[in-house]
Amino acid sequence: MEQEINSVKARLEEAMAEYGKEDICLAFSGGVDSSLLLKAASDAVGKTGKKVYAVTFDSRLHPSCDLAIAARVAKELGGIHKVVSVDELEQEEIRFNPVNRCYLCKKKLFQSLKDFAGEMNIRYIMDGTNEDDLHVYRPGIKALRELEIISPLAELHITKAQVKEIAAGYGISVASRPSSPCMATRLPYHTEIDYEVLERIGKGEEYISSLIKGNVRLRLHKDIVRIEVDRESMEELLERSGEIISQLKELGFTYITMDLEGFRSGSMDVGLDMEA
């Protein structure tokens, strides 16, 4: 296993050494995937005198804590942190949360990133898509391909588990940080996205995460909120249900439930035609 990880790490370093001959623009969330890329890119440009810009989207469709985390981690890893503000809901089609919302959002976000890179005369624009992302419902990947965004982790067939292991080996502070996807994934498709509702959901998730380790999602179905946590955290969720219910009621949620299937990425995609 160690030999395999060392081989994967070497392939990543070799690829980034080539890209590092020029300035690099990286979509940077502060999550483990983009942080590993930033580490590899920073090491590469450190040998060539070029620069790597770690660009974070300031978007209300993403948890507010992400911006502060991204700024801190970018500084730790040697990237030049930049922020690009985007309001996805300016686009009416996105606001009504269609099944291809992820595609539309990615197209809008990464067009903004391309505009930034163009102003800086940067040719290499990257994101942290990994191998595993290619095998689940990720309509946003189509937008990345259309915009010719480079995804080194996916191109090198590096899986999420390998990303985490390599990041931990580098001592990256967010190596075990749970993923933090777009807040629109908390609502059913064809439900109008409302920033006030997403803010309440975000506060609820933040509160539960302060009590329970691991993944936490609040999925809202009209007046029912469905709590997803890792299966090993279910017992603790039940033990602390009184205070959690009280807090969620204060946030305006009516019916509060625990999903017995536990946390699973993309649970709102159940029943979709993935080939559509």
For each predicted feature, which ranges?
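ATP-dependent adenylation/nucleotidyltransferase module used to activate substrates
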Residues: M1-G169, V225, E243-F253, M258, ...
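AMP-forming adenylation/ATP pyrophosphatase catalytic core
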Residues: R138-A276
